[in-house]
Amino acid sequence: MEAYEQVQKGPLKLKGVAELGVTKRKKKKKDKDKAKMLEAMGTSKKSEEEKRRCLDKRTPAQAAFEKMQEKRQMERILKKASKTHKQRVEDFNRHLDTLTEHYDIPKVSWTK
């Protein structure tokens, strides 16, 4: 019986896991936080522009490449936004009509 006297009596403890308990919720600060956020937004816009100028270490080719990518992206968005859903469906159906019968899907039945 002496061998069992040193046994841990209680729940097992996991390493690296904080003990779970009741934690109090933090109170929200409304007015002060809003004023600070508005002030920070004004200064952050100015600082962002300055950071862009200072931290822009791209080569001219990289800058031109990104500018063209943005331009093409805008063109794609405008092209997709110009058609309505109904027009897209009609175009798709016209495309399916032009395909050969090789692409037709045969009737599939799971009962046979």
Curated annotation (Swiss-Prot):
GO BP annotations, alphabetical order: apoptotic process
Keywords in alphabetical order: Apoptosis, Cell cycle, Nucleus
Sequence segments annotated as region (Disordered): 23-56
Tissue distribution: Widely expressed, with highest level in pancreas and lowest in muscle.
Pfam families registered for this protein in UniProt: FAM32A
UniProt cross-references to InterPro entries, sorted A to Z: FAM32A (IPR013865)
Domain of life: Eukaryota
Gene Ontology cellular component terms for the protein in this record: nucleolus; nucleoplasm
The UniProt record lists the keyword Nucleus: yes
Subcellular location: Nucleus
Keyword Plastid: no
UniProt similarity note: Belongs to the FAM32 family.
Function: May induce G2 arrest and apoptosis. May also increase cell sensitivity to apoptotic stimuli. In cell lines, may play a role in the inhibition of anchor-independent cell growth.
Protein name: Protein FAM32A
